[in-house]
Design a protein with these regions (language model features):
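Catalytic cores of the polymerase beta-like nucleotidyltransferase superfamily
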Residues: 1-446
């Protein structure tokens, strides 16, 4: 991380240039110029600035306006085209560039791909009426906006407009906390106001190799009882964010050590074996997993993490957690399928391929992958063969072929096609001619 002396506007502008693609940087300068023309201070605030300073910057950032962000975004759209989406209650607007924007902008840096979009936010203050409540929002100053942040490391702002481009604004000790590697809230009631910050504190601590400040550990211990007052959706969202991280195993272990997991729900387990399973997700996925889908809207890593973490629980415990933490239907069913599968794996270890396929075909593929990662050695070969080969075995004969042979549509179709697949799986058929001979016999039987 650069020293305090290196964080002058020129050096910050240089860091920004290194972190952003040319098209984003050019558009940022354009937006900064537009803000100057309207007399609006414009900033990047929070996580992007934090990550810029520790060398991990991405492309996800909000542009904070000391003024009316919605009006500013609409004026940009009127001048440069694109679509604006407004959330008036929060004073936010999203500007998505489109082909019309490309025609109006004289920037020769655009390349094919996803067109940039920018989120504009009015500087605002927040008030929490009671622990765990969503905040009441109203327009405010930059100081107000920084003061509503969760941790001091997220209170750094980078000014963009005019002569101030690259100026680092640090009103609340964020730079010192970042340099010391401390996760610290802004005020003693912070964890009580929003108990999800407890989970976020651990997430930041483990992601960056920081330490939660000693006084914060005391505040967390006093506030963790308020986790029970949060909705299942909010808690699950925080768990989703943790499970998407590379250091998810360390994060969950830390939460367990602080007695936070049982504070979320008494049935949430943790042990060293689960830690090793989640760490295994850092290894490249086997080739046999090609084509394995996500669990609908749940990314594959997050879905697998839930399955490895909770998939050995009893069905009644899974149902309880799924209800309390507002799991999606697809995650609930995958967990229940995996729980049942674990009980059957010993019997599948020496079974015929057709028996294995009959048992696994109704199980979500991601649950089969989780079983492969967590199963004892005797079950590994059948799970690997299913994922790599057996699930793709199909007879050459189709329903259209049966129609051509004069067989009227009905239950016999499924019986015939299933019998042909079983014969291929169990090695009873070697050639297409073998299949045709068996097909003739099956048609005569029905």
């Amino acid at each position: 991380m650069p020293s305090h002396e290196q964080l002058n506007p020129k050096e910050m502008a240089s860091l920004l240039k290194q972190a952003l693609p040319p098209v984003h940087l050019a558009l940022l300068h354009l937006l900064a110029d537009e803000a100057v023309g309207r007399g609006l201070p414009l900033y990047i605030i929070g996580g992007f600035v934090r990550d810029l300073l520790v060398g991990r910057a991405g492309l996800d950032f909000d542009l904070v306006v000391e003024g009316d962000a919605v009006t500013f975004a609409r004026s940009i759209s009127e001048k440069y085209a694109g679509k604006v989406t407004v959330h008036a209650h929060f004073g936010t607007a999203n500007w998505q560039l489109d082909s019309g924007s490309l025609a109006r902008l004289n920037i020769p840096l655009f390349e094919q791909g996803v067109l940039p979009m920018f989120d504009f936010v009015s500087a605002r203050s927040e008030i929490y009426t009671h622990p765990g409540a969503l905040p009441t929002v109203k327009r405010g100053s930059l100081a107000d906006d920084l003061g509503r942040r969760d941790f001091t490391i997220n209170t750094l702002a980078l000014r963009l407009d005019g002569e101030y481009f690259g100026q680092l604004v640090d009103l609340l000790g964020g730079l010192e906390a970042l340099q010391k590697g401390l996760v610290r809230v802004l005020h003693p009631n912070s964890y009580t106001d929003d108990p999800t910050r407890i989970l976020r504190a651990v997430r930041y601590e483990q992601r960056y190799g920081f330490q939660i400040a000693p006084e914060d550990l005391e505040l967390i211990a006093a506030a963790k009882s308020h986790l029970g007052g949060l909705s299942g959706e909010r808690l699950r969202h925080e768990l989703d964010l943790i499970l998407a991280e590379d250091e998810s195993a360390a994060m969950l272990a830390r939460l367990n050590g602080l007695d936070i997991l049982t504070g979320i729900h008494p049935l949430l387990p943790w042990d060293a074996h689960m830690s090793r399973l989640l760490e295994s997700l850092d290894e490249p996925a086997p080739a046999s997993w090609r084509g394995v889908p996500d669990l609908l809207h749940i990314p594959q890593r997050v879905g697998l993490s839930y399955l490895l973490w909770l998939g050995r629980l009893a069905p009644v415990a899974i149902q309880e957690l799924a209800s309390c933490l507002d799991f999606t239907a697809s995650l609930r069913e995958a967990l229940l399928s995996l729980s049942s599968l674990h009980a059957d794996l010993p019997d599948l270890a020496g079974a015929r391929p057709s028996v294995v396929v009959a048992r696994l075909d109704g199980v979500p593929l991601l649950a089969v992958c989780a079983a492969w990662l967590s199963a004892d050695d005797p079950a590994h070969p059948v799970l690997e063969n299913y994922l790599a080969h057996w699930r793709r075995v199909k007879p050459k004969t189709s329903g259209h072929d049966l129609i051509k042979r004069g067989l009227p549509p009905g239950p016999a179709y499924q019986l015939i096609l299933s019998s042909l697949r079983t014969a291929w799986l169990d090695g009873q058929l070697k050639t297409n001619e073998d299949e045709l001979l068996l097909l003739d016999k099956l048609i005569k039987l029905v």
